[in-house]
């Protein structure tokens, strides 16, 4: 029998005990929650808004449907899904991190998004929802922080309705070599400095860069989704593969 206390995983470039990673990731997001939206705009030059818009366009979400915005953070996708599903639909904004969930709730209420949105603190590896609950699940820039990604994908598959779809928006591997080198230089030298100046937290943004490099590439993630049960899995490279959107269905 394997001693679970001896099982390891990665936290950025570090090797840590599996049972420690969730707490370490939680510390990162507790630290950056208050500056999360500002940093997203600065780090991506605002392009993250286009990536998320494309995700919405590919979701096929319609009025009356039920959507899970997993690792939904400050609620960018939830705000848009709320309008799409209307009064007869529902969006669940779920995040494992209490600080991020609080920021999302406050932000959405301040812009008048109420009524058809619920907030749930949840671990992607063990989603607290019945089987066949959601028409669509999105996880945006969250999967790379999950300790057991395969377990999380199986959990998402379980709570999707037949005919439902999962969309994973995540940093990936640039497909143009010169861009890859420039991206590395930006990630490891510029991002931590921005984090230090704006959020007073260089370490969290160093972890961000490292976690991106440790995340599975496009084809590996596609295979992982297929292994979890998803069918008709495909992906779109955005900004030359800096980010990829994967989509899979439960039939």
Curated annotation (Swiss-Prot):
Pathway assignment: Quinol/quinone metabolism; menaquinone biosynthesis; menaquinol from 1,4-dihydroxy-2-naphthoate: step 2/2; Cofactor biosynthesis; ubiquinone biosynthesis
Keywords: Menaquinone biosynthesis, Methyltransferase, S-adenosyl-L-methionine, Transferase, Ubiquinone biosynthesis
UniProt keyword annotation of S-adenosyl-L-methionine present: yes
Domain of life: Bacteria
EC number: 2.1.1.163, 2.1.1.201
Pfam families for this protein: Ubie_methyltran (PF01209)
Catalytic activity: a 2-demethylmenaquinol + S-adenosyl-L-methionine = a menaquinol + S-adenosyl-L-homocysteine + H(+); a 2-methoxy-6-(all-trans-polyprenyl)benzene-1,4-diol + S-adenosyl-L-methionine = a 5-methoxy-2-methyl-3-(all-trans-polyprenyl)benzene-1,4-diol + S-adenosyl-L-homocysteine + H(+)
HAMAP family hit by this protein: MenG_UbiE_methyltr
The organism of origin for this protein: Escherichia coli O1:K1 / APEC
Designated name of the protein: Ubiquinone/menaquinone biosynthesis C-methyltransferase UbiE
GO biological process, alphabetically ordered: aerobic respiration; menaquinone biosynthetic process; methylation
EC category: transferase
InterPro entries found in the cross-reference section: SAM-dependent_MTases_sf (IPR029063), UbiE/COQ5_MeTrFase (IPR004033), UbiE/COQ5_MeTrFase_CS (IPR023576)
PROSITE patterns: SAM_MT_UBIE, UBIE_1, UBIE_2
